[in-house]
């Protein structure tokens, strides 16, 4: 086998192949449709962005350096939401808690201070998409 043939075989073995739908596996072994996860995972694409995590200090929350957060822009804020706030041209991730008129933004970064306030200023919040699913929507 020469190098040209070996390279062609390598491309065929390791080239991108989309995952088939379960129901299509038996019917069509040569699957040619692509599955776009954005259509299924992102409800509001114009209000959604991705934030690449470079901070290694959020391991206690299961967020590692190199992870990608799916973040949705939203005007509403609920206890338990993960929110992204910009401070000094850097993004920081907090968990929002509200109790008896006190509002706490608990930093997920172990080296960042929590923010405790009695008054919320009206601004747009960026909420980590994973915390917002339709099953919790009715309980809010």
UniProtKB/Swiss-Prot annotation:
Pfam families in the cross-refs: Peptidase_S24
GO terms (BP aspect): SOS response
InterPro entries (UniProt xref): LexA/Signal_pep-like_sf, Peptidase_S24_S26A/B/C
Family that this chain belongs to: Belongs to the peptidase S24 family.
The protein's name: Uncharacterized protein HI_1546
Organism: Haemophilus influenzae (strain ATCC 51907 / DSM 11121 / KW20 / Rd)
Organism phylogeny: Bacteria, Pseudomonadati, Pseudomonadota, Gammaproteobacteria, Pasteurellales
């Amino acid at each position: 086998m020469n190098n040209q043939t070996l390279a062609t075989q390598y491309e065929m073995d390791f080239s991108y192949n989309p995952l088939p739908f379960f129901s299509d596996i038996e019917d069509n072994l040569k699957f040619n449709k692509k599955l776009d996860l954005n259509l299924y995972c992102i409800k509001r694409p114009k209000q959604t962005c991705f934030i690449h995590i470079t901070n290694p200090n959020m391991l206690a929350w299961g967020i590692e350096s190199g992870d990608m957060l799916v973040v949705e822009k939203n005007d509403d804020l609920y206890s338990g939401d993960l929110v992204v706030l910009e401070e000094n041209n850097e993004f920081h991730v907090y968990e929002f808690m509200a109790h008896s008129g006190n509002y706490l933004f608990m930093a997920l970064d172990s080296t960042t201070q929590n923010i405790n306030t009695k008054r919320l200023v009206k601004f747009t919040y960026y909420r980590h998409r994973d915390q917002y699913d339709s099953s919790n929507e009715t309980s809010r």
